[in-house]
Design a protein with these regions (language model features):
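Membrane-interfacial helix termini and adjacent extracytoplasmic/periplasmic loops
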Residues: 2-7, 45-53, 58, 93-94, ...
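Interhelical loop and adjacent transmembrane-helix boundary motif
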Residues: 9-14, 48, 55, 213-263, ...
């Protein structure tokens, strides 16, 4: 009887827990995606391709995914470095900096867009300095990239931080004792341990950037074929009551996003198997 009490889970039985989980996943995730698929394919694959194959749509999709990838790569590098600094070093203001990392989570995206525009516009503080150097940030693709970096950075930092905290300093000391250089220790010891979490943060940052709308529309000039992102194009289609066109573009974004995230997931599985964390 004691053994039965020890093995008893605090959660409800498998049937009840699985039923609640599947129901909520269906309502929150599967049904909306299914509705998008049904709406996008209801008027035929040829019609979907006709909408997606337009130059303006291709330009918007290419811009969204290209800048999202660049932003996620930057966040992967800088977010990991920031997490390392916050965990391994004590310095004045560390707690304040750690709290500020979460600001993009709590800040409404429209407010973030307004703040970035005020800062990087030609008459803004940093925008005026960049203008003197012949570099325009706001209302260009550079401004879009900054907005995507802003909203995606916390995903990498917060994902990697707990993993860094679990790495004992003795591991680095043992590597140094065996004659390994800092670069070798970082490349062959630390980096493999961080890779699965870093890839997770990268995927989250990428997914967040692809769907970003609120902060981008303020700092981008929203010029078709140049600074018009795919989510904005969907909104434009909806405002014109072209629901089929909006669904077709949304379906294209869904397919591309799924393919990219699936590839990242395969890389994560490979990295876990390589490090033995299956």
């Amino acid at each position: 009887m004691g053994k039965a009490l020890i093995q008893r889970s605090a959660m409800p039985g498998l049937g009840l827990s699985a039923g609640i989980t599947l129901t909520m996943i269906s309502i929150v995730v599967l049904l909306p995606i299914g509705a998008l698929l049904a709406r996008g394919l209801s008027f035929g694959p040829e019609a979907v391709w006709e909408v997606v194959n337009r130059d303006r749509v291709w330009a918007a999709l290419h811009l969204s995914f290209r800048l999202s990838l660049f932003a996620a790569l930057f966040n992967l590098a800088f977010g990991t470095l920031l997490a390392w600094v916050l965990v391994r070093y004590n310095f004045p203001g560390r707690r304040i900096l750690d709290a500020m990392v979460d600001l993009p989570f709590a800040l409404p995206t429209a407010v973030a867009g307004i703040a970035l525009t005020a800062l990087y516009a030609p008459n803004g503080f940093l925008g005026a300095m960049a203008k003197d150097l012949g570099w325009k940030i706001a209302y260009t693709q550079w401004g879009i990239l900054l907005a995507l970096i802003f909203v995606g950075l916390p995903f990498v930092t917060r994902t990697v931080q707990p993993v860094i905290a679990e790495i004992e300093k003795e591991v680095e000391e043992a590597s140094a004792t065996l004659g390994a250089s800092r670069a070798y220790t970082l490349r062959r010891v630390i980096f493999p341990m961080l890779l699965p979490a870093a890839l997770t943060g990268f995927a989250l940052s990428l997914a967040r950037a692809v769907g970003e709308y609120g902060s981008v529309i303020f700092i981008a000039a929203n010029i078709p074929m140049r600074t018009e992102i795919a989510p904005l194009l969907i909104v434009i289609q909806l405002e014109e009551y072209n629901y089929d066109g909006a669904a077709a573009i949304g379906l294209a974004m869904l397919v591309i996003s799924f393919a990219v995230l699936f590839l990242i997931n395969l890389i994560q599985i490979w990295s876990r198997r390589r490090t033995g964390n299956v």
